[in-house]
Amino acid sequence: MEPIEVFKALSNESRLQILQWLKEPDRHFAPHEGIDMNTIGVCVSQITDKLKMTQSTASQYLTILLRAGLIKAERIGKYTYYKRDEEAIGKLADFLKTEI
């Protein structure tokens, strides 16, 4: 994980909001076809609906978070599910504690 890329990813309010929502997906999203959102993640269409923006914009935001290493993606059938990468977020917290 590159700290500059992480900070760039988090500098957008909507991307930060996505990361916050994914911390407690059951609280922020309706269930999706029997998927355990805490284990598998949240479908891009659910994130798009909650953001009230186009799927292409939401997908761009998710790609930026993915490239920064803050989230993981898993494709199941025709859907892609996203969840936080807790290990990477823990490393970011450690970086902030020790380096800044």
UniProtKB/Swiss-Prot annotation:
Disulfide bonds: none annotated. InterPro entries: ArsR-like_HTH (IPR011991), HTH_ArsR_DNA-bd_dom (IPR001845), HTH_MetalResp_TranReg (IPR051081), WH-like_DNA-bd_sf (IPR036388), WH_DNA-bd_sf (IPR036390). Residues 1-100 form the HTH arsR-type domain. GO terms for biological process: regulation of DNA-templated transcription. One of its GO terms (molecular function) is DNA binding. It comes from the Bacteria. Keywords: DNA-binding, Transcription, Transcription regulation. PANTHER family: TRANSCRIPTIONAL REGULATOR, ARSR FAMILY (PTHR33154), TRANSCRIPTIONAL REPRESSOR SDPR (PTHR33154:SF33). This is Uncharacterized HTH-type transcriptional regulator YbzH. It comes from Bacillus subtilis (strain 168).
